[in-house]
C-alpha cells in the first residue's frame, strides 16, 4: 500500500537519509543524515568532490541504493514503503543519464531508444513512433539507422537522453553526464537539458564537480562534503556569498578571481614606485554589473585607477561582475576619502 505524503510543490523529499557501507574492517558513512527537497520543475544541482556522496545520495531517489535510514518521498509517496510492483511504476518516471553513455553497440540509435519500452504493452509501431519523436526532440532525427560507433560523444549522450525520456519521466537524474565531453559539446548538452526542462516541465537533478556546469543550468544547488550537505540555496546566492571553504573553492574555479589576486600581488609590474595604491576586489550583481561605478568614484574623489582583472559571469540568468582595481593617488586623498569610497563600492555590491 502506497504511503501518501502531502507535498504540494516538492517532487522529491529526502528526509534524514543515511547510507552505511560495512566491511570486515570498518563502517563507511557515505551519506550522513541528509535532508533535501527538490521542487517540481526545478533544475537542482549537487556539487562536491569525488567521494563526497553525491552519486550515492541521488541513487536513493529511485532506491537503486536503499538508504540505511530515512524516508524517500517521490511525488508524495514514501517509496520505501511500497512493494516491488509499485516501485517499478515509480522508477519508470525517473530517467537517468551518466558520464558513460551505456549504449548497446549492436543496436541502432532507434533500437537503443526503443529498448526501455520493450517491457511495456506497446506495439512495435507505437514504440518506433515514440522513439522517432524523441530523436527529433534531441536533434538526431537524421541518425535513425546509425550505430553508436558512428556517433560523436555528444551525439551518444543525446541518444542516452532520448532513451532516458522514453517512458515520459517526470524526473531526470544526470550523474556527471558532461564530464567526458569537451567544453563546446558540454555547452550544447546543457542547453538541451534546459530546453527539455522548459518544454516537458522536467525536474532535473544534476550531479557534477564543476561549478561552471552549476552556474550554466541550475536554479538551486547543494554542496556536499564527507556525506553531508554543508551549504544549500539559490545558485546566485551561493555564487555571490559562499559561506563554506569548499563552496568558495568551487566558486573560485569558475571566476578565477583567487588566482588573479595571487598573480597581481606577486607581480611587481603592477606596483608604481612612490605612489600609494590600494587593491580592491569589487563584485557587482544584476543591474549594477553594468553601471559606471568606477567612473563615478574617480570623478568624485580625483583618484586614479587601473583595472587589473575583470569579467562578467551569467549565473542562472543573473549578471555577476568581478573586478580587481588598483586605486592610486596622493596619500591624503586615499586616506581622507577611503571610507566614502568603500561605502560607494559596497552600496553597489548587491
Curated annotation (Swiss-Prot):
EC number: 7.4.2.11
Record's GO cellular component terms: plasma membrane
Domain of life: Bacteria
Name of the protein in question: Methionine import ATP-binding protein MetN 1
Principal cellular location given in the protein's record: membrane
Residues covered by the ABC transporter domain: 12-251
Assembly information from the UniProt record: The complex is composed of two ATP-binding proteins (MetN), two transmembrane proteins (MetI) and a solute-binding protein (MetQ).
Leading EC class: translocase
Keyword list, A-Z: Amino-acid transport, ATP-binding, Cell membrane, Membrane, Nucleotide-binding, Translocase, Transport
Taxonomic lineage: Bacteria, Bacillati, Bacillota, Bacilli, Lactobacillales
Organism: Oenococcus oeni (strain ATCC BAA-331 / PSU-1)
One MF annotation (Gene Ontology) recorded for this entry: ATP binding
Catalytic activity as recorded in UniProt: L-methionine(out) + ATP + H2O = L-methionine(in) + ADP + phosphate + H(+); D-methionine(out) + ATP + H2O = D-methionine(in) + ADP + phosphate + H(+)
Residues annotated to bind ATP: 48-55
Record bears the keyword Glycosyltransferase: no
PROSITE patterns per record: ABC_TRANSPORTER_1, ABC_TRANSPORTER_2, METN
The UniProt record lists the keyword Cell membrane: yes
Record's function text: Part of the ABC transporter complex MetNIQ involved in methionine import. Responsible for energy coupling to the transport system.
Entry-linked Pfam families: ABC_tran (PF00005), NIL (PF09383)
Membrane topology: Peripheral membrane protein
Subcellular location: Cell membrane
Amino acid at each position: 500500500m502506497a504511503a501518501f505524503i502531502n507535498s504540494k510543490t516538492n517532487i522529491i523529499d529526502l528526509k534524514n537519509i543515511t547510507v552505511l557501507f560495512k566491511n570486515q574492517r570498518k563502517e563507511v558513512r557515505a551519506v550522513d543524515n541528509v535532508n533535501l527537497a527538490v521542487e517540481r520543475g526545478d533544475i537542482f544541482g549537487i556539487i562536491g568532490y569525488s567521494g563526497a556522496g553525491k552519486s550515492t545520495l541521488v541513487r536513493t531517489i529511485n532506491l537503486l541504493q536503499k538508504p540505511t535510514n530515512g524516508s524517500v518521498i517521490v511525488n508524495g509517496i514514501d517509496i520505501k514503503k511500497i512493494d516491488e510492483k509499485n516501485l517499478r511504476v515509480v522508477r519508470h518516471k525517473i530517467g537517468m543519464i551518466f558520464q558513460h553513455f551505456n549504449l548497446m553497440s549492436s543496436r541502432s540509435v532507434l533500437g537503443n531508444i526503443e529498448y526501455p519500452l520493450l517491457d511495456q504493452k506497446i506495439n512495435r509501431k507505437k514504440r518506433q513512433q515514440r522513439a522517432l519523436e524523441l530523436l527529433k526532440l534531441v536533434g538526431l532525427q537524421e541518425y535513425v539507422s546509425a550505430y553508436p560507433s558512428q556517433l560523436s560523444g555528444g551525439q551518444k549522450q543525446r541518444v542516452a537522453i532520448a532513451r532516458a525520456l522514453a517512458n515520459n519521466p517526470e524526473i531526470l537524474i544526470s550523474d556527471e553526464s558532461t564530464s567526458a565531453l569537451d567544453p563546446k559539446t558540454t555547452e550544447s548538452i546543457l542547453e538541451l537539458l534546459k530546453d527539455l526542462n522548459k518544454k516537458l516541465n522536467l525536474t532535473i537533478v544534476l550531479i557534477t564537480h564543476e561549478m561552471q556546469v552549476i552556474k550554466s543550468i541550475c536554479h538551486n544547488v547543494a554542496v556536499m562534503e564527507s556525506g553531508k550537505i554543508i551549504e544549500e540555496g539559490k545558485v546566485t546566492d551561493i555564487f555571490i556569498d559562499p559561506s563554506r571553504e569548499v563552496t568558495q573553492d568551487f566558486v573560485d574555479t569558475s571566476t578565477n578571481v583567487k588566482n588573479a589576486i595571487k598573480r597581481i600581488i606577486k607581480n611587481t609590474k603592477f606596483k608604481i614606485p612612490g605612489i600609494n595604491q590600494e587593491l580592491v576586489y569589487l563584485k557587482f550583481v544584476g543591474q549594477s554589473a553594468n553601471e559606471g561605478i568606477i567612473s563615478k568614484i574617480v570623478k568624485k574623489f580625483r583618484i586614479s585607477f587601473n583595472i587589473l582583472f575583470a569579467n562578467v559571469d551569467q549565473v542562472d540568468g543573473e549578471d555577476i561582475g568581478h573586478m580587481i582595481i588598483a586605486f592610486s593617488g596622493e596619500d591624503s586623498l586615499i586616506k581622507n576619502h577611503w571610507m566614502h569610497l568603500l561605502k560607494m563600492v559596497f552600496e553597489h555590491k548587491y
